[in-house]
Amino acid sequence: MSAPEEHKETPLEVIHEFINGVDDGTIRRDLGEDCILSFYSRNVRGAKAITGFLRNQLTMRYKHEGFEEAAQIEWGDELLLKARFGRSFDSERRRIYEEKERTGTTLHVRPESDDEEVNEKFSSTLITPPRPSSYNLNSLKYVEACGLLNKRNEHIYGGLDMGESCAVHLTLGYRSTFLPGGQVSGFEICLAVYDRGLTSLKRSTLIPPLCSISFARRASARCNPTTDDEEDTEEDSTPPTARRCVRRTLFTEENTQKEEDADFIPVVEQEQPAPQEQPAPQQAEETGEVVIPVDISTALKTTNFSSCTPRKRQQATNGNEVVRKRATGPRRMRF
């Protein structure tokens, strides 16, 4: 008996085998039972579910073109793929194992006899489901390629709508297997990741691009000036724009200065009359006037201010005014 033939697939052969199966609808033969599809961050698990999804959403509307180069992914990207899909692989393997356990038969053929009692023997071995591990992911080989998804000319309703053409970065994880005959080795796809917009190989599909495009802001864009605690130096601060919000407009230095100027009223110094000089005693004797010395402090204490400033001013009355007459008693009219 001859040994099985070993055939090492190139990355480009694996990519072409997969896209040909997707385009003609025969992708089921290339998928493993625990396969996972990530189509633009939408995950589909299981070979049957993936086959139905690709036939309904992709095969009838788009066709793979331009996949001329393929290469193995970098070690860093491989670690990212394992960290991203490791838990999904473990849960999918557990689901497959539980389905096989439920479908297994539990019937046993025993001789029917009323006289003999058959002692049931229980096995002492414990059957446990597979523990979470990344064994399947570690055994996979990963390849990547870039191409296009071009829309077919047929007018078919339904499925995905990604425009006339869409750039695709395709990453596949596969493992080597033996065909049913046992003489020829093959491979089965266990992971397929579609990413949009990437056109170069040897770069991660799971992290954002290193450089980002920055657009210059318009001159008329709304911008508020920084406050005193936000700006470092006066030289670095930019002049304020024409547009400002209400709060910034009310509490700017210009407006506060204007308010202070409006409230400021210049005080005009009133000319105080010159103090009158008291006549000397010699002049008083000549004029014959008697000068009585008055203490200012005692005069202020004895002066009654109510007499100076009455609470109600007395209005001057003319002689032609008539005093108002008001009826009292029963003669008073009631309304």
From Swiss-Prot:
Residues 325-335 have a biased composition (Basic residues). GO terms for biological process: mitotic cell cycle; regulation of cell cycle; regulation of exit from mitosis. The rux phenotype is suppressed by mutations of genes involved in cell cycle progression such as CycA and string, and enhanced by mutations of intercellular signaling genes, Ras1 and Star. This is Cell cycle negative regulator roughex. One of its GO terms (cellular component) is nucleus. Residues 227-237 have a biased composition (Acidic residues). It comes from Drosophila melanogaster (Fruit fly). Disruption phenotype: Rough eye phenotype, and/or male sterility and in, some cases, pupal death.
